[in-house]
């Protein structure tokens, strides 16, 4: 965090029409916490928005991001304010990583920081600023102008990918039967033949930061059940997919396969339609608990509610989009 850079967060607030320009305020040498604040024309309001980021070191593998918004309630049109008379809103999130910071991890921090700013308390603090603040800081006395609301009839499918993303796990073909169903198991076991890496028609940015996909229909928000990260996707829980019921049902295409060699293990694999191949559920769950099977909830009959019962998920209501590796929140 020694090389802090200015950050511009746009498209925030209830109507997505507020922009915050955050400038570095230095790093606390005691705890390594870096702070960025909004700089404005009014000195008393210069720290109206403060974002603190605790960078992981080799011995501390957590990010902690805290957003603090102080909304001045005592300001005049001339720009004089009493900074002690404020109401504040806070939100924070801690990330756990499996290794030292990477570009992808930093991208996730930026994405989830934006998701934090969608918190209702912070939206209220952003949108309901004292009018005198807008007069002093923006010079127009009115704050941001309103923009059209969300699409009342959003598309059922997520936006198409803007590029390609390589599957981070080994992929397999399970087309030939190794051992047919018998008295010991009621499902076929297949030969697992490893394939060359393949790409999804989607980029990592689409999964972590596509604002057209994020909260695409007003339902999938930062705090929604079952691992939705506010980006319009859901962690389908690779551990649950390994249960016997998924081998015998048609909810998701899960097969049991034997890896190559005399001592090759028998594992369970999930089919990834986007690349026409299978991925080992054991590989996903073993990756420091950071492997994620990505599904996209699209069941209109639910009225927008994501079910609490994982057994209600299937390939029609929540088709698999990809598998990725991201730090869990």
From Swiss-Prot:
Pfam families: Levi_coat (PF01819), Read-through (PF16814). This is Minor capsid protein A1. Gene3D superfamilies: MS2 Viral Coat Protein. Keywords: Capsid protein, RNA suppression of termination, Virion. GO terms for cellular component: viral capsid. It is found in: Virion. This protein is translated as a fusion protein by episodic readthrough of the termination codon at the end of the capsid protein. Readthrough of the terminator codon occurs between the codons for Tyr-133 and Trp-134, thereby producing the readthrough extension. InterPro entries: Levivir_coat (IPR002703), Phage_RNA-type_capsid (IPR015954), Read-through_dom (IPR031819). GO terms for molecular function: structural molecule activity. Residues 145-161 have a biased composition (Pro residues). It comes from the Viruses. Minor capsid protein. Residues 143-162 are annotated as: Disordered. The keyword Ion transport does not apply.
